[in-house]
Regions:
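Acidic-basic catalytic patches of nuclease active cores, encompassing PD-(D/E)XK
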Residues: 1-25
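Hydrophobic residues on conserved beta-strands that form the core of alpha/beta folds
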Residues: 22-24, 46, 92
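Short acidic/glycine-enriched loop/turn segments that link adjacent beta-strands
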Residues: 30-32, 102
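Conserved catalytic cores of phosphodiester-cleaving nucleases, focusing on short active-site segments
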Residues: 34-56, 72
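Domain-level recognition of nuclease-like catalytic cores that cleave nucleotide substrates
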Residues: 82-119
């Protein structure tokens, strides 16, 4: 298991315990990647998972740059191209893990950002 998979597993456990349902893991396209695509009620949630051992440079959440946000939005647009039926509402969340790898703390930032260009 890679480090990224390990942190995604932590995030997935946290989100499913909160009632979200996994739709897809690691949606990749040439435009970007979404770590976890989850569903919360009628809302589709694109989740970016980040881990940082310490808080230097702003910590895990701060590492989701504007460029990364744009790539996530493009990857979600690609994901929705295959959607059947009315398009769902979409939200972009970040799960930031930090601290010791054995027991990282989890910070879930709901609606961490809007899709660039959406207002």
């Amino acid at each position: 298991m890679t480090g990224g998979q390990r942190w995604e597993d932590h995030a997935l456990a946290h989100l499913t315990a909160a009632g979200l349902v996994l739709e897809r893991r690691n949606h990749r396209c040439r435009l970007g990647e979404i770590d976890l695509v989850m569903r919360e009620g009628e809302t589709l949630v694109a989740v970016e998972v980040r881990y940082r051992r310490g808080a230097s440079h702003g910590g895990a959440a701060a590492s989701v740059t504007r460029a990364k946000q744009r790539r996530l939005a493009l990857a979600m647009r690609h994901y929705l191209m295959g959607w059947r039926g009315p398009l769902p509402r979409v939200r972009f969340d970040v799960v930031a893990l930090s601290g010791p790898a054995e027991r990282p703390s989890v910070e879930w930032l709901r609606a961490a950002f809007d899709a660039p260009g959406s207002g």
